[in-house]
C-alpha cells in the first residue's frame, strides 16, 4: 500500500520508478489528494495499481488530458467510468456525521500604495515581455513569463518576498495580523498556511515583534514533532505557521478552530487538505477557514472556477 500516493505523481521521478518496481500480488493506494497538479497525477497512481487500465502516458495525454482541457465532456465522463470501479471514497459526512460544521469565507485585502507601485512595475515588465514576443514558444520565454506570474503572486502577498530592501507594509499582512489579533484575544488557535516559506517568515517576524508565540513548520524544520507538540500542548501558543507542502497533509491539529489560507493555490484540493488538518474526526468545535485574497491582483484568477476545476 502506498500512503499519500500523490507523491508518485511525477512519472520521471525516482520515487515513481522505485514504486513501480515493487513486487506484490496486490496493490492499493491511499490519498486525500489524488490530483495535485494535473490529470497526469491520476495516471501515475493508476499505472502503479492497474498498469493497463489507462494505457501509456502518451496515450492518456491524447485520449483524456488534452480533450478534457478543451472542454470535452464525453472524455471526462469516459475517464470517470473507467476509474470508478477501482475507487473507494469516504467522505466526512459519511464517517463522521457528528463533525461540527465547516465555514469558509474569503477576506479581500487592498494593497498599500507602496505595495501597489511595486506590483504595477512588475506587471508592466511582464506585459513588455508578452508584447515583444506574443507568439513565442521558446522555453526561455515561457520561463520568463512564468517567473513574472510568480513574482506578481509574491508581490500581492508582501513585496519583501522578493525585494529584501523593501521597507513598506503590505495590505494583506496587515489584515492577517488584525484578524489574528482578534482571534487570539478570544482564545482561539489558528493554523496559517502559505505556499511561500518567505511569507511565513515575514509573518513570524511580525508576530515576534508583538510578543505572540507561534510554532513554525516548513520543509527545513529539523524537529517536526517538537513544533507540533509546542502548538498542541501550550495554551498560549495560538498560531501555527505551516508551509502548504510540508504540512498540508498527514497532521492532526484539531486543537485549532481557525484556518488561514494566506495565498491562494490553483488546486482547491490542496487547500481542502490543509483545512482538513483542523476539520477532521476528533474536532468538537466549529471550524472557520479564511482565504486572504489581494484585490486587483493576479491572485483573483486563482479563485475563479476555470483554473481550479479539478473535479
Question: Where does each model-flagged region fall?
Answer:
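Conserved Helicase C-terminal RecA-like lobe
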Residues: 97-115, 120, 134-251
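Single conserved hydrophobic/aromatic residue that forms the stacking wall/gate
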Residues: 302-311
Amino acid at each position: 500500500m502506498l500512503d499519500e500516493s500523490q507523491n508518485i505523481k511525477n512519472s520521471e521521478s525516482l520515487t515513481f520508478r522505485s514504486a513501480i518496481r515493487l513486487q506484490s500480488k496486490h496493490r492499493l493506494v491511499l490519498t486525500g489528494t489524488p490530483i495535485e497538479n494535473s490529470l497526469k497525477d491520476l495516471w501515475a497512481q493508476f499505472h502503479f495499481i492497474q498498469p493497463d487500465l489507462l494505457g501509456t502516458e502518451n496515450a492518456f495525454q491524447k485520449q483524456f488530458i488534452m480533450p478534457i482541457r478543451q472542454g470535452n465532456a464525453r472524455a471526462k465522463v469516459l475517464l470517470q467510468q473507467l476509474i470508478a470501479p477501482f475507487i473507494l471514497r469516504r467522505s466526512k459526512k459519511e464517517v463522521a456525521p457528528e463533525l461540527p460544521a465547516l465555514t469558509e469565507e474569503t477576506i479581500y485585502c487592498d494593497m498599500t500604495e507602496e505595495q501597489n507601485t511595486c506590483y504595477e512595475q512588475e506587471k508592466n515588465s511582464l506585459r513588455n515581455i508578452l508584447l515583444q514576443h506574443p507568439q513565442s514558444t521558446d522555453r526561455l520565454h515561457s520561463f520568463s513569463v512564468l517567473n513574472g506570474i510568480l513574482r506578481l503572486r509574491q508581490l500581492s502577498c508582501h513585496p519583501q518576498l522578493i525585494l529584501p530592501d523593501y521597507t513598506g507594509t503590505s495590505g494583506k499582512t496587515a489584515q492577517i495580523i488584525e484578524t489574528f489579533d482578534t482571534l487570539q484575544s478570544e482564545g482561539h488557535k489558528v493554523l496559517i498556511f502559505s505556499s511561500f516559506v518567505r511569507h511565513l517568515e515575514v509573518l513570524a517576524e511580525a508576530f515576534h515583534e508583538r510578543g505572540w508565540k507561534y510554532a513554525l513548520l516548513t520543509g527545513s524544520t529539523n524537529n517536526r514533532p517538537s513544533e507540533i507538540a509546542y502548538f498542541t500542548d501550550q495554551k498560549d501558543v495560538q498560531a501555527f505557521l505551516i508551509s502548504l507542502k510540508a504540512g498540508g497533509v498527514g497532521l492532526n491539529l484539531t486543537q485549532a478552530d481557525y484556518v488561514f489560507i494566506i495565498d491562494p493555490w490553483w488546486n482547491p484540493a490542496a487547500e481542502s487538505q490543509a483545512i482538513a488538518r483542523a476539520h477532521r474526526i476528533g474536532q468538537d468545535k466549529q471550524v472557520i477557514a479564511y482565504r486572504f485574497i489581494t484585490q486587483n491582483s493576479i491572485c483573483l484568477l486563482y479563485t475563479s472556477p476555470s483554473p481550479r476545476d479539478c473535479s
